Amino acid sequence: MEGTEVRKLAQLEDAHWWYRERRHLLAGQLRGLLPGRALDIGAAGGGNTRVLRDHGWDAVALEYGAEGAEVARERGLTVIRGDATRLPLTDACLDLVVAFDVLEHIPDDDAAAAEAHRVLRPGGTYLVAVPADPRLWSEHDLAVDHVRRYTRANLSAVLERGGFAIRSIRSWNVLLRPVVALRRRSSTGSDLEELNPVVNLGLRAVITAERYLPVDRWPGVSLLVRAQRRD
């Protein structure tokens, strides 16, 4: 992702309905986990890293590019630069790895999963969120440097090949999928943009309602997986 997109994302992250809901989902996944050492891969604006810290985790952000690392430091995060397929960490040093909207940027996602397995302690948790459904592929994906969108089957296969057991897999951003599909048909680039506050509030209400509806097995715009390192 270009530096301008990284900074745009960081500016949007605090209030944008999509990022707020993603932080809520992360917080939900942390319930029941004993806090320890965590790595947030692709931290960008640092919202997820702050969620980890707020829940008692000793969290470090990882960014590939200089611009992303600079943004993370400006926001008060402990950050290291590195490649998700060659993490600058020792074996079995972490209890949790978070990779939200990361794998879709990496040509060799098998290598990224294997690296997460290497740095996790036996029984450690790998939380992964990715864009779902190749049918939604559009100019937006190209603009933000995606190389793929995932299905449940191929995401599960990547993680299982990497040495993980799938503990849960769910869709999210389900209710708005028809709107996203329609908009992406005429997309000419990234849809990362600041929204009218009223529109943002309305979309936030829709995505919040999704928490209370049994739709997590329906087709959505994104997938969220909780996986555990097999010993």
Predicted features, each with a name:
Residues 10-11, 126-148, 152-160, 183:
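Short, glycine-/aromatic-enriched active-site segment of Class I SAM-dependent methyltransferases
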Residues 173-231:
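A C-terminal cap/extension of S-adenosyl-L-methionine-dependent methyltransferases
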